[in-house]
């Protein structure tokens, strides 16, 4: 992994991890276009820049890490359980789906879902306008919705946001619960991969790792802030359109 590729992947991870456009899908495509081989070391690099994105959430929502918000974190933990169980049981099946055609199709499917959701969504009818108001029942349904993110190209953020909106959360609360839910999900996935591949890195890899980590953290930190501001004035329609267009481009490249 050279410095240039580390910066590019760090930027992509930072932008896409918490937006409903599938960070995994973008990383897979970018790696192929950059000619980065799917070696264990390069896959472990992906884990490192993902950890940076996790820290960006911690930095943005440090006020939520207090005893008075314990109830919120219990709900986050409950929402994590469905994905954790399914990912553990079907990990080999999931890995077999990591290819451009699957990513392209799921980009389109996710885009259509967002367009259909926004067509009938009325924010003034939402029962939950703050992330701390999420109920246990809502947390369970959001967790079930997040399971679909195991299909590459679906987007963890996208599936959890859709689930949250369908459960009565407004757009901002949906996005923020998705951010917080990303902490145990990404920490579990990253921790597991690091335990498997920690011995693969050499001293020569440290510079690229550091550059990718810092890049991902900075970009993710500001992406989260800008995304929340965006949702105060706009809908997810633009993300739905982007997903469909990007998915069509991927399938065209894959089959033409």
UniProtKB/Swiss-Prot annotation:
Keywords: Antibiotic resistance, Cell inner membrane, Cell membrane, Cell shape, Cell wall biogenesis/degradation, Hydrolase, Membrane, Peptidoglycan synthesis, Transmembrane, Transmembrane helix
Manganese among keywords: no
Catalyzed reaction equations: di-trans,octa-cis-undecaprenyl diphosphate + H2O = di-trans,octa-cis-undecaprenyl phosphate + phosphate + H(+)
Localization of this protein: Cell inner membrane
Location (main, coarse): membrane
InterPro entries on file: UppP (IPR003824)
One Gene Ontology MF term: undecaprenyl-diphosphatase activity
Family the UniProt entry places it in: Belongs to the UppP family.
NCBIfam families tied to this protein: PRK00281.1-2, PRK00281.1-4
UniProt cross-references to PANTHER family, sorted A to Z: UNDECAPRENYL-DIPHOSPHATASE
HAMAP family: Undec_diphosphatase
Protein name as it appears in the record: Undecaprenyl-diphosphatase 2
Species of provenance: Pseudoalteromonas translucida (strain TAC 125)
